[in-house]
Amino acid sequence: MLDERMIRIVVAFIVSLLTVLIITPIVKRIAIKIGAVDQPSNRKVHDKIMPRMGGLAIFIGVVAGVLASGIYTETRMTAITVGAFIIIVLGILDDKYQLSAKVKFLIQLGVAIMIVSTGLKMDFFSVPFLTERFELGWMAYPLTVLWIVGITNAINLIDGLDGLAAGLSVIGLSTIAVMALSGGKVLILSLSLVVIASTLGFLFYNFHPAKIFMGDTGSLFLGYSISILSLLGLYKSVTLFSIVIPIIILGVPIFDTTFAIIRRILNKQPISAPDKSHIHHRLMAFGLSHRMSVLVIYLIGFIFSISAIVLKSATIWLSLFIIFILIIFMQIIAEVTGLVNEKFKPFTKFYKRLVKRN
């Protein structure tokens, strides 16, 4: 007979999925009515006005799933829920009024500080091959705040093609769910699955050709959710490789952001300057269709996620080897697609010199 908790989780998953499937068309009409729409531009791939704010449907689905699962009684859920509500309101206002980056950052900072004030933080750091552990002390507070704010924005940075951010979030959250299941962490498993179900329900309307965009309402909420779930998994103890796992789960947006910064520095552009050279843009410029570009990035995200799962139980040397291979893998993709520019190919140049010597 199935455990009662597992039955609740399955019911919560179904409730979240059905809620979003039903509510998304309503959210779409509301977005159009209030003018929360995305205008076409030369930096964007869509050529018509699109309703934003789809993240509101995801949020409503998550709330429905949480209520169905009964996990709202958990002690840490109050602060997490308040933070999620603030992030959703922030996203809705941004989708409608295009808030400044400074305003968004300050509000996210406030949410992160509120979460940390409840005691949910990383208290010490340990390295597997050293016996001594390093107490973070007062540094636990800024590091945890940085973690929450950084990951909250990570999904927003990759939200450039139909279904891309939603699909990558599902892949990342599924990885967290698998790890939570293997570790017997019911709260993380339950939250992960209701967010997955809600995002899948939204993806039905968001995959190419999209009928609605998630907007900052969705990307910020999904980023916030992943930051909290990964933090719950790291709670108190942070090891060298445990902190790498959520970074690998978010490998695609982190990789894309890192190379965007390198690109803008080398091209002498402001770091915050928008451009059309993100990985999804480069894949399309490479000749891939909109849908195929998304699927290729899904595959990359899947590779990262499988690597994260293997890392969880790998030896130190295998962990280092996997991380090294992932770095080389992403560097090759960056050079092949011209992610920085056509001249930035250090690995290719090194390989050619090596071949000539032999």
Curated annotation (Swiss-Prot):
Protein's GO biological process: cell wall macromolecule biosynthetic process; cell wall organization; lipopolysaccharide biosynthetic process; teichoic acid biosynthetic process
EC number(s) stated in the UniProt entry for this protein: 2.7.8.33
Domain of life: Bacteria
Location in or out of the cell: Cell membrane
Principal place of residence: membrane
Pfam family, any one: Glycos_transf_4
Function: Catalyzes the formation of undecaprenyl-PP-N-acetylglucosamine. Involved in the synthesis of anionic cell-wall polymers as it mediates the initiation of the linkage unit formation that appears to be common to the two types of teichoic acids attached to the peptidoglycan of B.subtilis; may also be involved in teichuronic acid biosynthesis.
Transmembrane segments: 10-32, 53-72, 76-93, 105-127, 137-157, 164-181, 186-205, 218-235, 240-262, 292-311, 316-338
UniProt GO cellular component terms: plasma membrane
Important in orienting the substrate (site feature) positions: D94, D95
Protein name: Probable undecaprenyl-phosphate N-acetylglucosaminyl 1-phosphate transferase
A molecular-function term among this protein's GO annotations: magnesium ion binding
Database matches in InterPro entries: Glycosyl_transferase_4 (IPR000715), PNAcMuramoyl-5peptid_Trfase_CS (IPR018480)
Keyword annotations from UniProtKB, A to Z: Cell membrane, Cell wall biogenesis/degradation, Glycosyltransferase, Magnesium, Manganese, Membrane, Teichoic acid biosynthesis, Transferase, Transmembrane, Transmembrane helix
Pathway noted in the entry: Cell wall biogenesis; poly(glucopyranosyl N-acetylgalactosamine 1-phosphate) teichoic acid biosynthesis; Cell wall biogenesis; poly(glycerol phosphate) teichoic acid biosynthesis
Record keyword Transmembrane present: yes
Broad enzyme group: transferase
Cofactor(s) demanded: Mg(2+); Mn(2+)
Annotated organism of origin: Bacillus subtilis (strain 168)
Topology in the lipid bilayer: Multi-pass membrane protein
